């Protein structure tokens, strides 16, 4: 049956997922099939790996259907975003925020958005096979009606899809990834702050031993996160400095006419 075939595919996907992970050396959760009731979870994880990208994940049949979106989601219907389908992930991975070890996308994971999703397609499996899944999101940042469509190999890979926002009250010409770049799990945290201890349940309790290959790897990740953070702060400091300089020069220019007026007044009195 279709359900049995889907279950077989899910188990195969989780087996592939587990084969890439070393759970004794990482805070990332192990693969597990979850059976639960209630609204379906969706998450978008911002992943600073070799290249910054976003991972869209939709709960379905106990796992998370997953797509890597290089530029992140767009709420502008005109802006179709490439989404590369990846292996299904375990449900428990959905709320993960922390560090991924070397070997399968080493880097930092930020929980950029999460909430619930509802398929607008009656049969999700059939929609995926057809390559046209319509759904609604209700998250902190992403809401309303969406569609993810397969490109069917037109100049792309077999796993190439497009993530598109439908026109509704939640659409607009805003770059949502720039407008709202920070974590929704750790309030207003960037990558550097995720590593700095604001998420102790994930980062501090799984801190690697100093030295060795693992220590060197984490050192590089931390340095990269800090450079991202300092770059933003540095830009902000420059603008503040410019503002201060212009304010001082304006005050000086304003003071000159006053000084001239005062000297003229003294001359008249004499």
Which ranges hold each PLM region?
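Catalytic cores of nucleic-acid ligases and guanylyltransferases
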Residues: 7-270
């Amino acid at each position: 049956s279709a359900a049995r075939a889907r279950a077989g595919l899910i188990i195969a996907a989780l087996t592939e997922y587990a084969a890439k992970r070393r759970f004794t050396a990482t805070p990332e959760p192990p693969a597990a099939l979850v059976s639960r009731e209630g609204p379906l979870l969706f998450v978008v994880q911002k992943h600073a790996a070799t290249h910054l990208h976003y991972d869209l994940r939709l709960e379905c049949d106990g796992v998370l259907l997953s797509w890597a979106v290089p530029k992140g989601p767009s709420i502008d219907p005109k802006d179709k975003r490439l989404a590369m389908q990846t292996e299904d992930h375990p449900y428990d991975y959905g709320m993960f925020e922390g560090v991924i070890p070397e070997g399968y996308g080493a880097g930092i994971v930020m929980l950029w958005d999460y909430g619930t999703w509802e398929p607008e397609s009656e049969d999700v499996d059939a929609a995926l096979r057809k390559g046209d899944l319509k759904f609604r999101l209700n998250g902190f940042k992403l809401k309303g009606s969406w569609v993810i469509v397969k490109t069917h190999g037109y100049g792309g890979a077999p796993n190439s899809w497009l993530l598109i926002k439908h026109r509704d009250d939640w659409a607009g010409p805003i770059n949502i990834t720039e407008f709202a770049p920070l974590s929704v799990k750790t309030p207003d945290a960037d990558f550097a702050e995720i590593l700095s201890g604001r998420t102790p349940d994930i980062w501090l309790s799984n801190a690697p031993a100093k030295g060795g290959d693992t220590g060197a790897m984490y050192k590089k990740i931390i340095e990269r996160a800090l450079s991202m953070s300092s770059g933003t702060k540095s830009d902000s400091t420059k603008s503040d400095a410019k503002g201060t300089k212009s304010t001082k020069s304006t005050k000086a220019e304003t003071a000159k006419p006053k000084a001239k007026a005062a000297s003229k007044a003294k001359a008249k009195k004499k």
